[in-house]
Curated annotation (Swiss-Prot):
GO MF term list: hydrolase activity; nucleotide binding; RNA binding; RNA-directed RNA polymerase activity
Bridged cysteine pairs (disulfide): none
Highest taxon of source: Viruses
Ranges in a coiled coil: none
SUPFAM superfamilies in alphabetical order: DNA/RNA polymerases (SSF56672)
Function of the protein: RNA-dependent RNA polymerase which replicates the viral genome. Catalyzes the transcription of fully conservative plus-strand genomic RNAs that are extruded from the virion into the cytoplasm where they function as mRNAs for translation of viral proteins and also as substrates for encapsidation to form new virions. Once encapsidated, the positive strand is converted to dsRNA by the RNA-directed RNA polymerase. Displays ssRNA-binding activity.
Enzyme Commission number(s) of this protein: 2.7.7.48
Source taxonomy: Viruses, Riboviria, Orthornavirae, Duplornaviricota, Chrymotiviricetes
Protein's name in the database: Probable RNA-directed RNA polymerase
Family membership: Belongs to the totiviridae RNA-directed RNA polymerase family.
Length: 1907
């Protein structure tokens, strides 16, 4: 037997979708299936003899599985035992039990749950008996040789025994109710008494109050059964209180049984297999008992030993060998249970033949031959598609193999296997992109494989009474058995329900079913159709009695298959089967596949055809059976009661439509309406839009979509649904439509709907299909009127199956041009939808209208399906033309999303005093509209949904607005042909669709009055949509658009417009105006000096004037809010436009972005920030996910962990124990906040170490209280954000595990959090490469709020695993303690957050204050991404992925796959920020760095605040020094109980000190520290008295720093800061300070200080190990902020280089390059804001170039002028860019866009100089005349770039130039007049696309030209 592993699938009972362990399926990495042989079946044969006789086993469980013809329930011993278990009183006659089960099932699905049966079934799930069996089994097992695996047997049950099946048939329906109803909807009291059976109490069960849960209407919620709850609590209590408490509420809110078991197996059992003896016996005992309770055996409600035997072996395998690579396994399974099944087939010791085990296969599906020829074969393929489920080997040697592509093959003994439609078969399987599947169809023997006979399958045993009559065999072994056996892809609830119902149907087809049973069964099925309207509940072949059917329609015999028919000739499809028996209706739906024939290949190729499937109803007369078949192409007119048979053009009599509009159609219509509404969530929606249909049916519909449309139908097939079924439940209409890929829950495409109206009634006009003359298999689409006359001929063609439909839109357009299409839809008084014609809109006799539009699923989701969608007239009739025929072909959601879903919108609210209050933003959110109106005293609710996009840019939007008074406003807006979208308002009959103009129209239905903007109506609402698809439109309208975007939300003010002339007059000619915001002033001044387009300079002038006016009129707080709102909006618009900028905007859009950061930090506080942010963050209900999300997420997380992290024992640092780690603060005592306890005692981590001894820190971390999380306010540049502060306990515990895992998790390229320097460099290089594919930056909104407890908990447990596996031997005990402590304090059942009204339990969300927040965020983010890719079938298209926090740098193969992926994000409820999302082949953004081909740039505006305010000024104490007062301060509480540390100078209790006093403490206390400092100072003083040797001085300095660091316990970089302070040196200040300023020692100190400054750091330093050495590539530069004096604009960078170590290295780069402030900004943009690391200070400058004083590090002068000293980290520029250049090329460091040089070809070097000039002219873009006028050529030697000089001007002898190979410096004078008037930039050839554009607007241009 072959064993396999797999993951469970989501279901209503498994909402989180973990591996369902009742089917097996722990971590697939635990077990290698290919290593398991058939030896497992026969290794322990004697076990079956002793197992049942064990005295520990109760009598009820000792009946061996092989006992036959003795009903278990009738055994006295078992009855007694059952009585002891509480079940014997309910033991009844076989027929009574069956009827009772049927009645109970009927009551549940028709009237609600039936309570009386629940206690009876509870007693059948008794865990005491299960534990007794476990104990009996374990007594015979050598625990030292036993291992626990995750195995799944071939069958969930052991087959082949008549008696067992008889018992199961009696209780199968009840069992369905037990598993779907009872175990799903139990609630259990939290109180437990000591008499619990598992705690040694009595055998009774008095402590649980079993009742129906309130979640009975939500089948996807599940609570744990009492026994399961108790067993699991017992099991987990032996390890730690990690996941659960004794409350069923936990499971209701977060986890459910299978999830818990999965986590239990994955988390508590190490992935490295260890002997069972490593665990406590009670843990193994409880685990196996829980497995038994929840396994498939529990479903039998029977405690026979055979059930136990078939459950336990899935998980317990015993090994008798210590050699893990070559061990013999056997199952604790009596061989008698399987011996008959294999008696003729498989030898006990045999293994799989090589032919059936190809190398590299990871999954195999073996299917018996008999099943291939059955009508259930397609079902089996679907149900086994997710993993190996059915393995059976035959001795048949006839094997034929056919390869299926590159990932699988089909092997079969069937001769015509090659004739199978392999592509269709392949489409039935779902793959994750990596699996290789073998489909092996094996010849079978009747002795152990069920033969197929009379529509049912029978088991391999004997028939009733020992006969071989298979026709009278046990009916349970029919289709229901197959569903039970192969239902891995069918959830537990559905499969069991189908098992019961199908068994019931097979039962009533036999002769002994009573009429009462049949009636009850039909009622059950009718109720079932309400819950599962699309399941094939009635399907059991096609009896010959079908031909004797006497209904109104007599099908031909060819519609019913026969086994002797060579070929199926199906000519019509069946979508519904309606059966009426005794006035009770049963409805079923057949799948679209035909019946089998002898030639399975012939039958399988006809799978797209469907047949009527009937069943024989016992002994009832067939005359009572009526059915109506509705073909997809049939059309029902509800208003006239007429039904058209489109195939024959005949009208079906209305008398025969008695049952076709019953329950089934209502449910089906609801389903399709839901189908159209649920899955179309896209990335631009905040939350998942829910349908009016109840949420309980969501998983049912989802399963149908995913399994039957995605898997079975396949990507290339689609079923065409009709308009009215989608729009409501009262009408049915069949309309041919275009082929659409129905895939992945329809999220890929909107639904194209053809709306057709005729006259005053609806439905009499329809499209029919008739055969095309002379063409076999092709049908013609025509349109008929209500009299049957053809209105339009040859409208299109369609295949008989209608898989492909092609419409001739040119003919439709010609017909349409003769008709009027305005058909209003008006709600009638009775609420029913009726269509009343607008008589004024019709002309001619036909009165026929045809409107073609799109309705996306979003369109329907806003309305109840039972109500009319439109209640007002609509006049939106876009004209058709010949080009519109491509619309259908181009229709797809990927095209819609890739077209750029952003557009600009502006809403104007007109107040009573005619003031316009504009607001704007992305129209799908309209972020400011509600705020403006609400704060203006009105209430306006707006909802907008994107309804369609035809792929060419045309859009339709539907928006519904509602005011407080209840008045409704609706309007349409559209973009036509990809051109400018201006505005379209409906319903206004006077509005026409015209591009190129803006229409201002009131959105008021009552008052259809044209209103101009110049004449506003008070109280009206206006809207303007603008869509710019051309760069010219953006440039021309940018300034105009920005004028209306200023507003004051808090004060309800309207800012009047400032005309451009008024703005200029206000500003005057000064060119510089103080706006009150220093950073904004400087930045605008910088931009004003740059060579930018004229309209941008005009905009800057206007912007500055606006800011000044607002600052003059309002208070500073109001001004801040106004400008913050306006600038944020400006950033959104500019970034949106930057996504598409390819023309004149180029990359300059980054200069206009992030103006809001120039305002400084938010100056106001928001007291309600905690409630507004923390409540939805941590304490609100979790966001609902689809059921398949959690199973995929769990599988992906485990696979990602094993693929990414290989446990490596810590080697880079000493393996410290946790106690030793607490005493090493240099490993964990970093800067940052933390707190201990509940009081207001905020400590820096250094101060905690200084105040507490190591023992106290150790005790607090492991055994102290667990304080709750604390929310705090954090002001930022653009908002006040809430952060969650965690305690020191969690910090130091997580730090320790991170320290242990340092060598395991470092240097991982999937996240920047774990990257090293080389990987960071490669990331930047990769971002600049832009080779192939598309870039998809995915930024989740409020990422910390997105993960729920399950997502976070999974990675917490996996990290615990990783830490345990990485722990050195010496630290294993410490790691176990830390993990246990973390599991009890940071996992969510025990995690709380402190709010104003008390501590609240954390329900979801990732706290921001954990040490692991960044790591967990990265892991969760990448797992979510891989999960979304798995669910959207786009995993194979991922090219590269890097994450950090909520940002993802993602590269994919194509746009369609990217769109599908992001659409899946929205469908799962994840909010993707639309402002930061796009799909582009040549642009990416990651961590605020924009990447385009050849360059990675930042946002220059973001660096200004950092330059001005955020970075440390050296003249003031470092931030480390400023911490010293805290370090020296000990709270009174600590002072009383904790003795100060003697080895830490600042631990003494002192008053608050400034840093100088702290230095004094450091210098003078304790004595040995002071003495050490004194000795070293004397030594250094004596050594430097003479001329010191630099090498000796360097060595001396290092010894000094090392000794002082060790003595003072100060980190090295903190000590280096102290060494620079003059006060530190005391009496030696004169000599030593001079030494530090003038010798090489100063350079060493400065260089080493550079290591600790902000910027990329060594990866290892984050884990507490010593940081790697970083080269100090820093340059200190000075640039003036005033540019009036020309001499100040030219600065010598060479004189400003502070790092003498690298000065010579960069001399040729910086000596003669002149740098200006705009150039610096561009340079900073090139580097990114993260690399501008230090602002020194503002200084005073004179009119001349100031002299640099290296001692004071200042610029000194007598004059007064503002300037600033900037320290730039150039490592990431020089080393990553400059070093890649050849010695012949010096890059243009001031270049904005790309690294480019102007080259003179070698062929012209020895030619005439004119050719060289011509080459330069072509390269630069100048005219030849201009080149001759402006170029002053200078020479630089090529071979010695370091010694290059540019001082010598090149002579005018051009012949010398021909002999010179080198780099040319081109100096362009900027001031031009007179003869040089043509040298202005515009005439110099500066165009927007030139690479030289906007380098800087200085007096000289620099070009670097390589010869």
């Amino acid at each position: 037997m072959v064993w396999g592993t797999g993951y469970g699938n989501p279901s209503p009972l498994n909402p989180y979708g973990f591996a369902s362990l009742h089917r097996g399926g722990l971590n697939p990495l635990i077990l290698a299936p290919e290593n398991i042989t058939f030896d497992t079946l026969n290794t322990h044969n004697d076990h079956e003899e002793t197992h049942g006789e064990s005295p520990e086993v109760p009598k009820a469980s000792i009946a061996p599985a092989g006992r036959q013809n003795v009903p278990v329930l009738q055994q006295n011993q078992e009855n007694e035992d059952n009585h002891a278990l509480g079940g014997s009183e309910d033991a009844k006659d076989e027929r009574e039990i069956r009827f009772s089960a049927i009645k109970t099932l009927y009551n549940y699905y028709s009237e609600g749950p039936s309570t009386p049966i629940m206690p009876h079934l509870v007693n059948r799930l008794r865990g005491l008996d299960a534990l007794a069996k476990i104990d009996a089994t374990l007594t015979k097992v050598d625990m030292n040789a036993a291992y626990i695996f995750a195995l799944r047997p071939t069958f969930p049950y052991s087959y082949g025994y008549k008696q067992r099946f008889s018992n199961r048939r009696l209780t199968t329906s009840a069992l369905c109710y037990a598993r779907t109803g009872l175990s799903s909807f139990l609630t259990v009291d939290k109180t437990y008494t000591s008499n619990s059976p598992l705690k040694g109490g009595s055998r009774g069960w008095p402590i649980f109050n079993v009742d129906v849960s309130s979640h009975v209407a939500e089948p996807h919620m599940r609570t744990l059964s009492p026994i399961g709850l108790e067993v699991f609590n017992l099991a987990t209590s032996q390890f730690s209180k990690t996941l659960l408490t004794a409350s069923s509420k936990v499971f209701t809110q977060s986890l459910y049984t299978a999830d818990i078991l999965s986590i239990f197996g994955e988390v508590f059992l190490p992935h490295v297999m260890q002997p069972v003896s490593n665990y406590t016996p009670i843990l193994v005992r409880a685990l196996l008992a829980l497995i038994h309770i929840l396994g498939p055996g529990s479903g039998n409600c029977s405690l026979s030993s055979s059930i136990f035997e078939s459950s336990i072996p899935q998980f317990l395998t015993v090994s008798h060998s210590t050699n893990m690579s070559n061990r013999t396994r056997y199952c604790l399974h009596t061989r008698s249970a399987y011996k008959d099944m294999f008696r003729n087939g498989i030898p006990p010791q045999s293994t799989l033949p090589p032919t059936l085990a190809p190398e590299g296969s990871s999954a195999r599906v073996l299917i018996p031959e008999a099943l291939v020829t059955s009508p259930m074969f397609p079902w089996l393929l679907i149900l086994v598609s997710s993993g190996p489920q059915f393995f059976l080997y035959s001795k048949d040697a006839s094997i034929n193999t056919v390869d299926i592509g590159s990932r699988g093959r089909i092997t079969s003994p069937i001769p015509d296997v090659a004739k199978l439609d392999l592509h269709r078969l392949w489409n039935l399987f779902r793959f994750d992109g990596y699996r290789y599947i073998d489909v092996v169809i094996v010849g079978a023997d009747r002795d152990y494989v069920w033969p197929y006979q009379n529509g049912v399958y029978v088991h391999g045993g004997k028939g009733p009474n020992g006969t071989g009559n298979y026709g009278n065999a046990d009916v349970h072994d029919g289709i229901g058995t197959i569903f039970s056996s192969f239902n891995n892809n069918v959830n537990v609830q559905t499969s069991d329900l189908m098992l019961g119902l199908l068994t019931l149907w097979n039962h009533i087809t036999t002769t002994y079913a009573t009429e009462e049973e049949v009636t009850m069964a039909i009622k059950i099925a009718a109720a079932f159709a309400l819950v599962y309207p699309v399941q094939p509940i009635v399907y059991s072949g096609c009896p010959k009695a079908f031909q004797r059917h006497t209904s109104y329609y007599q099908p031909s015999s060819e519609n019913c298959y026969a086994t002797d028919t060579a070929e199926v000739k199906s000519v019509w499809d069946t979508v519904e089967l309606s059966v009426q028996v005794n006035n009770a209706m049963v409805l079923g739906m057949t799948l679209p596949f035909g019946q089998p024939t002898l030639s399975s290949a012939q039958w399988y190729n006809n799978i797209d055809k469907a047949e009527i499937s009937m069943f024989k109803v016992g002994n009832l007369p067939l005359q009572n059976l009526d059915y109506l078949s509705l073909d997809m192409m049939e059309f029902y007119a509800p208003t006239t009661g007429q039904l058209y048979d489109i195939r024959s053009d005949n009208l079906i009599l209305s008398a025969h439509r008695t049952v076709n509009l019953g329950i089934g159609y209502t449910a089906l219509a609801d389903f399709f309406a839901y189908l159209a509404s649920v899955p179309a969530q896209s990335f631009y929606h905040d939350r998942m839009v829910t349908s009016p249909i109840s949420k309980q049916t969501y998983s049912v519909y989802e399963r149908f979509i995913e399994r039957f449309i995605d898997d079975f139908v396949g990507w290339d097939r689609c079923d065409l649904f009709n308009l009215d079924t989608l729009l409501g439940a009262k009408h049915i209409a069949g309309v041919a439509s275009s082929p659409i890929p129905w895939h992945c829950s329809l999220q890929r495409c909107p639904l194209p709907i053809i709306m057709h109206y005729t006259g005053l009634t609806f439905g009499q006009e329809h499209i029919t299909v008739r055969d095309v003359a002379g063409v076999e298999g092709l049908q013609q689409i025509v349109m008929r009127d209500f009299q049957g006359r053809i209105v339009v001929e040859r409208l299109g063609t369609a295949a008989p199956s209608r898989i492909a439909v092609k419409l001739d839109w040119s003919r439709l357009s010609a017909w349409y041009s003769d008709t009027t299409c305005a058909i209003p839809l008006i709600r009638s008084c009775d609420g029913d939808r009726q269509l009343r014609g607008n008589m004024g809109s019709y002309t001619g006799k036909t009165r026929t209208g045809f409107v073609y539009t799109y309705f996306s699923p979003n369109f329907l989701s806003s309305f109840n399906v039972s109500e009319p969608i439109f209640n007002t007239s609509i006049n939106l009739t876009p004209p058709y033309d010949d080009t519109s025929q491509a619309v259908i072909q181009n229709l797809s959601m990927p095209q819609m999303l890739s077209f750029d879903p952003y557009y600009e919108s502006t809403f104007y609210v007109v107040s009573a005093d005619n003031e316009w209050i504009p607001t704007s933003g992305p129209a799908w959110k309209v972020p400011y509209l509600e705020n403006v109106v609400k704060r203006s005293g009105r209430r306006l609710l707006a909802e907008l949904r994107i309804a369609s996009n035809n792929g060419s840019g045309d859009r339709t939007f539907l928006t519904t607005c509602k005011t407080r008074k209840g008045r409704h406003f609706t309007y349409f807006s559209a973009a036509l042909g990809g051109k400018i979208l201006e505005f379209v308002c409906a319903p206004l009959s006077s509005i026409s669709l015209q591009g190129g103009q803006t229409i201002y129209a009131p959105i008021q239905l009552q008052d259809v009055i044209p209103v101009r903007k110049e004449d506003p109506v008070p109280g009206s609402i206006y809207a303007v949509f603008k869509f710019f698809s051309e760069p010219k439109a953006w440039e021309a309208r940018a300034l105009k658009s920005y004028k209306v975007r200023f507003q004051d939300l808090p004060s309800h003010i309207v800012i009047s417009e400032l005309k451009e002339r008024a703005a200029r007059s206000y500003i005057g000619s000064r060119g510089y105006v103080d706006t009150g915001f220093k950073a904004l002033d400087i930045y605008i001044d910088i931009l004003s000096q740059m060579e930018l387009p004229k309209y941008i300079h005009e905009f800057l002038i206007l912007l500055r004037g606006k800011v000044c006016e607002v600052s003059r009129l309002y208070k500073k707080e109001q001004v801040f809010v106004i400008l913050l709102t306006v600038f944020s909006e400006l950033t959104a618009i500019v970034r949106h436009r930057g996504n598409k900028s390819t023309g004149s905007m180029g990359r300059m859009w980054t200069l206009l972005s992030d103006f809001e950061t120039l305002l400084g930090k938010v100056s106001y506080k928001n007291p309600s920030i905690i409630e507004e942010q923390v409540v939805p963050w941590l304490t609100s209900d979790p966001i609902p996910r689809t059921p398949d999300f959690y199973s995929t997420y769990f599988k992906t997380a485990v696979q990602f962990m094993h693929r990414t992290f290989v446990p490596v024992t810590l080697r880079s640092a000493p393996p410290l124990t946790f106690h030793e780690y607490c005493g090493r603060p240099e490993l964990w005592g970093t800067t940052g906040s933390g707190y201990i306890g509940y009081g207001k005692r905020s400590f820096n981590k250094w101060s905690i170490y200084g105040a507490y001894p190591t023992e106290e820190i150790y005790r607090l971390a492991l055994y102290g209280d667990n304080p709750p999380l604390k929310p705090l306010e954090k002001p930022e540049l653009t908002k006040v954000r809430a952060v969650i502060s965690a305690s020191l306990q969690s910090y130091i515990l997580m730090s320790y595990l991170e320290y242990i895992m340092a060598d395991t998790i470092v240097d991982k390229a999937f996240t920047t959090t774990l990257m090293n320097d080389r990987q960071l460099e490669n990331l930047e290089r990769h971002m600049m490469t832009m080779t192939g594919g598309v870039r998809v930056p995915v930024d989740q909104s409020n990422f910390d709020r997105q993960p729920d407890l399950v997502q976070i908990g999974i990675w917490q447990q996996l990290l615990f695993h990783l830490a345990s596996a990485s722990a050195p031997y010496r630290a294993r005990d410490s790691v176990s303690l830390v993990i246990s402590r973390l599991a009890s304090t940071t996992t969510f059942p025990n995690l709380k957050v402190r709010m104003s009204d008390g501590d609240k339990r954390v329900l979801h969300g990732l706290p921001s204050g954990w040490k692991w927040t960044a790591l967990l965020g990265a892991l969760i983010n990448v797992t979510q991404l891989l999960t979304m890719a798995e669910l959207s079938n786009t995993l194979a298209s991922l090219r590269s992925t890097v994450v950090q926090g909520d940002d993802i740098a993602l590269s994919m193969t194509d746009r369609e796959q990217a769109t599908q992926l992001v659409d899946t994000y929205a469908r799962q409820g994840f909010e993707v920020n639309p402002k930061k999302f796009w799909i582009s082949p040549d642009r990416d953004e990651f961590l605020r760095r924009v990447a385009t081909p050849g360059i990675v740039a930042g946002y220059p505006a973001r660096m200004m605040i950092k330059l001005l305010y955020q970075l440390t000024e050296p003249e003031e104490p470092s931030h480390y020094i400023s911490m010293l007062p805290k370090l020296a301060k000990v709270p009174n509480v600590v002072q009383e109980h904790v003795k100060p540390r003697s080895d830490v100078p600042w631990s003494e209790t002192v008053e608050e000190l400034d840093w100088r006093e702290a230095l004094a403490i450091l210098r003078h206390r304790p004595a040995r520290t002071s003495e050490l400092v004194t000795q070293w100072l004397q030594l250094i003083g004596r050594f430097t008295a003479a001329h010191p040797d630099k090498r000796a001085l360097t060595l001396l300095y290092r010894w000094f720093v090392r000794d002082l660091t060790h003595a003072t316990k100060i980190k090295k970089r903190n000590l280096l800061v102290l060494l620079q302070q003059p006060g530190f040196w005391g009496g030696y200040s004169q000599s030593l300070v001079g030494l530090l300023r003038t010798t090489h020692l100063a350079d060493m100190i400065v260089s080493e200080l550079d290591i600790g400054l902000p910027g990329p750091r060594a990866t290892s330093s984050r884990f507490g190990t010593s940081p790697t050495s970083l080269a100090p590539h820093y340059l200190t530069l000075i640039v003036p902020s005033s540019v009036h004096v020309q001499s100040q604009k030219e600065l010598d960078l060479w004189g400003l280089c502070r790092s003498s170590k690298y000065a010579k290295h960069y001399s040729n780069i910086f000596r003669y390059y002149k740098l200006t402030l705009p150039t610096l900004v561009l340079w900073a943009q090139r580097l990114g804001d993260k690399h501008v690391t230090d602002f020194i200070r503002s200084v005073t400058l004179g009119s001349e170039i100031p002299k640099y004083d290296p001692h004071a590090r200042l610029f000194t002068s007598n004059g007064v002028s503002v300037g600033m000293l900037i320290r730039i980290r150039v490592r990431h520029f020089t080393h990553r860019v400059l070093r890649r250049e050849t010695p012949k090329c010096i890059p243009v460091i001031v270049g904005l866009y790309r690294e480019q040089t102007l080259s003179v070809p070698e062929s012209v070097r020895l030619s005439e100089p004119d050719k060289i000039l011509l080459s330069l002219q072509r390269a630069s873009g100048y005219s030849l005349n201009l080149v001759k006028k402006i170029l002053q050529i200078t020479r630089k030697p090529v071979d010695h770039p370091v010694d290059a000089r540019f001082s010598q001007a090149f002579p005018n002898n051009w012949s010398d130039l021909a002999r010179t190979a080198g780099t040319f410096l081109l100096t362009v004078p900027a001031e031009v007049s007179g003869d040089n008037a043509d040298l202005v930039p515009e005439r110099l050839g500066f165009n927007h696309s030139s690479w030289l554009h906007a380098i800087f607007r200085s007096r000289k241009f620099l070009l670097c030209v390589v010869a």
